[in-house]
Design a protein with these regions (language model features):
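Catalytic-site signature of metal-activated, phosphate-bearing donor transferases
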Residues: 13, 21, 81-88, 139-152
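Active-site-adjacent helix/loop segment of glycosyltransferases
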Residues: 21-119, 124-131
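Glycine-rich phosphate/pyrophosphate-binding loop
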Residues: 115-154
């Protein structure tokens, strides 16, 4: 089920990724409707939201990504997070700046627990971590006008 250590962000992505790694197929129901209150738990620009987004994403990648993917993340992610933090600082959003570093602190403190979860995921693995990764750049697709998930897949 859901990882009880996650709160408010990325718990559903983490669950789907772990299910795929365990050999399950994640399916969609095209006619379904989802009513989602964005910012219902945390305000859009709150430091807590920045913290959970960064922390949970780091934890999810550590738990689920292949060794090669983790190497790429280990090289790129600190630089990208530093750029994000500096961007917050230049905008005068000091709390968001600090939230990025708090997320890294939590991630480092969680290392032992995450390593145990990773071993459990790998022991139950029947699928590949690579086959479900989008190979393009979401950032570039967004910048070139593909602002929806469906638009990015074209």
């Amino acid at each position: 089920g859901f990882d009880g250590d996650f709160f408010a962000h990325m718990e559903e992505i983490d669950l789907c990724w772990r299910m795929q790694l365990a050999g399950y197929r994640v399916r969609i129901v095209p006619r379904s409707r989802v009513y989602h209150l964005g910012g219902g738990t945390l305000q859009t620009d709150s430091p807590a939201k920045v913290f959970y987004n960064h922390r949970n994403n780091l934890a999810m990648l550590y738990k689920c990504a292949s060794p090669a993917q983790r190497l790429c993340v280990a090289v790129a992610r600190p630089a990208l997070d530093l750029l994000a933090a500096l961007s917050y600082l230049m905008q005068g959003r000091r709390d968001n700046f600090r939230a990025v570093f708090r997320a890294w602190g939590d991630f480092i403190r969680w290392h032992g627990a995450l390593a145990r979860k990773r071993r459990e995921i790998r022991a139950n693995r029947k699928g590949s971590a690579a086959e479900n990764i989008y190979r393009g750049s979401v950032v570039l697709r967004y910048l070139f006008g593909r602002r929806t998930f469906g638009g990015m897949m074209r």
